[in-house]
Amino acid sequence: MVEVQKEQVYVIPLRDVKRVPCYKRANAAIKDIRGYLEHHMKSDDVKLDKSINELVWARGSQKPPRRIRVRAMKFEDGQVQAELAEE
């Protein structure tokens, strides 16, 4: 079994999504979350949990949240898994 190498909680700002056409905003938010985690966790292999996707799409494609709190875990093989962080 692969062990967790690094675990971190991030608050990811999604304010730049407002610059995207309204019908593409949720897709852009998912890409921003993935890109943010790739940059900060230094890995190209990022897997997002279903709960993140459901939160971003909860109000439809035109109104994603302004920020999202995520717990990211990097494993020894370089894969990053992200899930919603409990408060």
From Swiss-Prot:
GO terms for biological process: cytoplasmic translation. The keyword Ribonucleoprotein applies. Coiled coil: none annotated. Keywords: Ribonucleoprotein, Ribosomal protein. PROSITE patterns: RIBOSOMAL_L31E. GO terms for molecular function: structural constituent of ribosome. Gene3D superfamilies: 3.10.440.10. It comes from the Archaea. The keyword Ribosomal protein applies. One of its GO terms (cellular component) is cytosolic large ribosomal subunit. InterPro entries: Ribosomal_eL31, Ribosomal_eL31_CS, Ribosomal_eL31_dom_sf. Belongs to the eukaryotic ribosomal protein eL31 family. This is Large ribosomal subunit protein eL31. It comes from Methanocorpusculum labreanum (strain ATCC 43576 / DSM 4855 / Z).
